[in-house]
């Protein structure tokens, strides 16, 4: 057993990534040896202690799990704990009581609160373990709404049931930083693994590279068709590595006045260095760094020269990684594509069937799907669809479903009855009809109208 007993009642365990089926459900999957040591059974509650304290419901890992000694939790639980994947936390069994009162605060949106809404949220949270300061997700009409536990009585790990007095505040949390986790990215398993090694590791543990006497990668160029997840991958890397992110959009930063664009670039690189660890993400880099022999204006040539100067020398830039994204890698100036600048290039390609299934699971997570929908079969039909295409397809399928129900809905009434809303579902034919509307990105050049 590779588990590390902390004492007779707790274990030190490594954090692992949750699967799509567990996202937003406060589950922690652990192996049978860990269950035996902690004397817990599936469905019981465990306390998790990282930088902060949280809790989760125990579930068994899959039999074919490659890392049975890890505790698998979703991105929201990792945030509640203040940890990232591969960090070590303390795990122990905990006895919970029923919460007498709980106060929730919406994280991003201002909400209109009435008794019906409060009862709906309370019903969704019934049985879930919570503690003060946690953030939790509630699926409301297909959308995930996040709440922060503002107050809980008694002050310990508790569960919500019918007797709990639940209060929901209408004002949102003011200091919310939007967080995208690895569970929000589908179809890029191998790419995420590689990017974590070359981006997240140097940002979190630069001492590893100092000890070995080598410099980590200073820049990574992501290339591939539009909508495959290049920007999303950059955002999730910044979030999971607790790095500050500075975005530069190629066409937007260009300025016709002499020296303005170069000054903007210098300011962004300086700010990133002052607030390191940082990730600078340059989207559509071919717009600001085209091949100099193919452009006639001095502005583009000066900008390329400035970018080359800024990217030279890791020690001068500090703990900063530069990510560039383009769907035209051959249009980028070759001087940028050499060691010391963008010294690694990674293709973010159109997802395969397994990748499309992952993406479908993400975008249909809150959708009421009919029983005739088998996501694996649907994914096999979506050849050539990128992540953005699948997101658009799911939205279009929902619109098709709404059109089917419109004759039964009284649009003049102030509110649509909750019974009517609960009966709505999306059928397989809605997806098939939507496939005529959403043309896959990878097939557009072959598409005949």
Question: Which residues does each PLM region occupy?
Answer:
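AAA+ P-loop ATPase motor domain of ring mechanoenzymes
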Residues: 2-19, 153-449
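Beta-strand/loop-dominated core regions that host nucleotide or nucleotide-derived cofactor-binding catalytic loops
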Residues: 1-183, 197-200
